């Protein structure tokens, strides 16, 4: 009776340790086809040809996990998503088999990547997605603020008569020359650099602030680097945001930083809505401290002028988070996302993934020393294997690759293969010994 209780305690201890470990995606003739889901869309025509030979692809068209089908929550091993759905820790815990999420785009602030990593879910993005489109849209917004094209168009649509010089002065009030103006870029990654190249062609002097970037890039692009945000805000006639959103830079543009900007400067944001405190921006626009602003992203999306702090703000251009979009960019992003899912299925997570953003939080296995070896299936315990318990390591002549994976809780594997033959005696003295071989019996010191 005492022996039974002892084994029961060991089993419970192993179950607790392995509770957070998710298996690698099982792929092959001995396993059912893995399920991959597009969470917040309904068109899978691009993804299907890339994945159809090894996975079942489904769509959910959901805006929250409450709208996701139960089969996807229980069985999906891979998920693709745009920016229109948010996954918190609570949401991620609802997925029972999920191993990889690919964000179809560059930003991933709508996924709790730390919680995902701790749950054994890799999160990937497409960092080169729509760089040209976003840069082009940003420059369009900048030109619009300087040349007032949007307001001139609106005046004509409203029936304003523009004929005399006085009428032109009135309707085009605020239009400014670009040459010699200073454009300040906060964040100087792919998109920031693309904006700099375009802006220089229009006559801007370009400066940037990016505390994470190594020195030297400014020389190759002929721009100037500043080393504090305050310096950038003070020197810039137009400020454009090109950084990811995180807990450190939320509301980077707020009442305090706006007061450090030049009187009458412009502000452009095609990065993330949470970077700008919209209440502070609205007040600055009304007071004229900021001459004009152009926003493609907003704190609350989908954006509406009918509500929120910006509804009465003057000199404001807003677009509905579309700076990234072109037919070509959309196609490339979807192909890249499906290809990353394919890497996850055919390779190992996260090692095989090209753009995993949460490796530092990732939990893949438990150290050997904390798991009782006797709970491991006998065939997988012995001289041939030395891997963390629960992970089936494949040695020459052992299990086929299709059987490689994690066995939660040490559940026995059922297969028709012969058992692994272990040496019954020590090797011959004449047999060479490989130094550093890690495959000795785990109990041997």
From Swiss-Prot:
Superkingdom of source: Eukaryota
Phosphoserine PTM sites in chain numbering: 428
Keywords: Differentiation, Methylation, NAD, Nucleus, Oxidoreductase, Phosphoprotein, Repressor, Synapse, Transcription, Transcription regulation
One annotated Gene Ontology cellular component of this protein: nucleus
Reported tissue expression: Isoform 2 is specifically localized in synaptic ribbon (at protein level).
Record-listed NAD(+) binding positions: 106, 186-191, 210, 243-249, 270-272, 296, 321-324
Positions annotated as active site in the UniProt record: 272, 301, 321 (proton donor)
InterPro entries found in the cross-reference section: CtBP, CTBP_dehydrogenase, D-isomer_2_OHA_DH_cat_dom, D-isomer_DH_CS, D-isomer_DH_NAD-bd, NAD(P)-bd_dom_sf
Main location per the UniProt record: nucleus
Region Disordered, annotated ranges: 414-445
Family of this protein: Belongs to the D-isomer specific 2-hydroxyacid dehydrogenase family.
Protein name listed in UniProt: C-terminal-binding protein 2
Protein source organism: Rattus norvegicus (Rat)
